[in-house]
Every structure is written in C-alpha cells, then in structure tokens.
C-alpha cells in the first residue's frame, strides 16, 4: 500500500536484487490520494501484480517472489518460512496480521523494521526511527506495544513512527457497523514512512 510500495521501489532502485512482496489487496479508488500504484489504469487489479510489474520494469533482472495472500496468525509461518529472508519491512496496516508478522520475526530472530501509523498526522519532519519500546505519540504503536507485551515481546525491533500528536480533526466518526472511526491520511506521509523504512 502507501508505505510498502515506496519502500519496495526504493530498495529495488538501490540495487537490492532479491525481493519478496506479500499483499492480497486490490487497488481501489479510495487509495488514490496516497498510493503510488493507485491509478485509473490499475483500479481493481491486485496490488502485488501491479507492484511486480513496476519493480520488474525498474530492474528486469530482479529476483522477485510475489505472494498474493492475506497474512494471518495461522499462515504466517507457512507463507514465510520457505523463503530465505535477510530483512523484512512490515508495512501492514491491519492489527492482527501486523502482530503475527512482528511476533514471527522476533521469535525467529529475523531483523525487521515496522511502520506505525501515519493517519491523522501531517508533519514529515516529525518521523523517527526507534525501538518499539521508545515510540510515542502514536496510537497504533501504543496498541502494538500493549498486545506484544502480552506475547512476551517488549522490545527488540525498530519502528518508523511520527512523534507528532494525531490531529483530531482528521478522525471522522463513522456510523457504519464494525467501524467506529475513519482516520484521514495525507498523501505524502505514508510514502515518507516507506522511504525511511
């Protein structure tokens, strides 16, 4: 999505020759404000396929593995263990798979950097990298820390987060079932998180 696409592209442009991308989402019109892949010509296409095409266009010799599946606590090991991964960039924005991925990496001593929340924030100069235990002013990082502590993990991996306090007017209350609020995201911030990852 907004973070992972930019992270993957910059890694390929830096000369990294082996990349694995995992994403099961389709490109949607609601992402056009912040995702590099979200264009009229790509709407409805699988993000992993569009990204694979883009990365191969940058480096035709790229050794690229594409996994077009939704990562869950139940399948994280099955999806990742067959691959030799030297470093992992976590750009997941959904809590359960994010926790599963972080836990898998920490428990298997796989180095990673995890992107925290860019929603309701605007100031790119406030982006920081720190151990998860040192992150602050980020509601997503707070929840991640709390849930990971219950899993016996309190530190040991880097996160990209913003020290900016969330802007309350960027949070919209929703009346839809199973959705309490929607957090607005400015176009450039997820990309900045991805570049820093």
Residue ranges and their predicted role:
Residues 1-197:
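Adenine nucleotide-associated cytosolic modules
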